[in-house]
């Protein structure tokens, strides 16, 4: 009895120590237990909501660029956004870029609000100097917003499943609702007011850092990696066949090792990201899509791609062993079909390809997260964050192709 009593006291003390180690440092009322902590639950919900709103800011920036920049400039900036996100960086650097981005996007949106208030038209018809200044401001705001999302994405990708899936759903809804408002709200006063409010909300709070500080996030990292360290600093120790102890740091994993076994699935999104705008442009050059209303079609395709991706994700979880195979077969087949239909002179080929690309990009991101080891998640998130942004960039590029080519 004495031994059991001592063991119970030891377990209780261990639990107290765990609570202290995972207790949030900046969230008042945190009790150090995810199942009992209402403060961290409320913080998580509010910060994930802001993560979704950040996608609305990115979409607004892309719409603004469309109105003030030429197609070549738009395409170039989108390419730079992608390239700037490919290089793996430390969490500290991501946080610094996000902090700078929040300041820049606030300054940009307030500047455009002042221009609108004084009656300055925002279009390509302005004198060169004024147009150049407005274009640079629009580009700066968009790039800043994307780098905030990069930090948000890396944070949620390495967090609990619920954080990741809410982020994926929230960013999709944020972008789609912004396009819907742009299409159907005729009063610019309403749009500008919403834009200022949203940018202010997402800029005054560091959503990603707050999410990392919740006891929910800290407990999940301890469960996955057996560590209480912050994101990017985990070290996992293993023993090889020779009995030698090896340390694996999440910040220094190689991409070759991270994507071992899922190489084909990691290649599908970038291939489709390259092929899709080309097919969309070709279909407009040969006048296959002359009857299509571009804004409505790209919106419908975006919604359809998201529905397919999230619907099939549930199906994939039921069949874990063959998940990689069916993803590869499904999206390869639909993409090849779309290409064949396009060259056959049928008008809906490009739409099939774009829908497949949106769904494939989102699905592959989710499948890669399920496939990589916990220690590899941090490095994998640096690539998948670019895949995620590329989904929305490709939609925008296809819209530009249809606008300027037709």
UniProtKB/Swiss-Prot annotation:
Q: Which organism is it from?
A: Varicella-zoster virus (strain Dumas)
The source's superkingdom equals: Viruses
Q: Where is the signal peptide?
A: none
InterPro entries membership: Herpes_UL43
Which GO cellular component term is one of those annotated? viral tegument
Spans traversing the lipid bilayer: 48-68, 71-91, 103-123, 126-146, 162-182, 188-208, 266-286, 299-319, 339-359, 386-406
Q: How does it sit in the membrane?
A: Multi-pass membrane protein
| Upper classification of the organism | Viruses, Duplodnaviria, Heunggongvirae, Peploviricota, Herviviricetes
> What's this protein's name?
Membrane protein UL43 homolog
